[in-house]
Amino acid sequence: SNLPVLNIGSGRIGYLVNSLNDIDFNKILKDKNVDNIKKRTPIIQNQDENLPAFNEIVIIKNSPTRILDIEIEVYDQNVKLRADGIIISTSLGSTAYNYSAGGPIVQTSLESIIITPISPFTKFPRSIVVDSSSELKINIPKKQHYSIQFDGVEEYLSDTKSDEKFNYKLSSVSYT
């Protein structure tokens, strides 16, 4: 459905959050034109499963004493990374975990994907910003213990006993 979203901060930090004093609820309820509201849904695909996230997808290690080996392919370039994890953010989500991990704040009107490592051990750019239509492939070699979180909710936990290599593909961010 085409329902507008009203952001109201409930914590101490809130980006794009209005003060309740600044909100004209009558205008919002009367306004039928919601063209300026965009839906951002990056999708991560694992085999036949599609899992959406509004702000970010985080792949993070589950053991404090281990490091993850992550292989990333974007624009036909392969990068191997050793880090505590990786954040894949939308431009709107760039002000959340991405920013806390040292990533850039990206203007929300830019249709982009931000790739930010979490405590990288290898030499890797702090962040990479790519066009939202870019295909991003992530490979996590077998027998590593990690979880995947979508907007802070854990959706997947790896099985360290499996000999399977986990391959993920991030489809383009949808802006409608």
State what each model feature region is.
Residues 1:
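N-terminal glycine-/serine-/threonine-rich phosphate-binding loop
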Residues 4-6:
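Proline-centered loop/turn at the N-terminus of a beta-strand
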Residues 9, 57, 152, 168:
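A residue-level signal for conserved active-site and pocket-lining positions in enzyme catalytic cores
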Residues 11-85:
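Catalytic core of DAGKc-family lipid kinases
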Residues 38-42, 53-55, 66-70, 84-86, ...:
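A generic structural signal for short beta-strands and their flanking turns/coil linkers
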Residues 80-84, 88-124:
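Gly/Ser/Thr-rich active-site loops/lids in small-molecule metabolic enzymes
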Residues 135-160:
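A conserved acidic, glycine/proline-rich C-terminal tail/linker
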Residues 176:
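Conserved small/polar residues in nucleotide/adenosyl-binding loops
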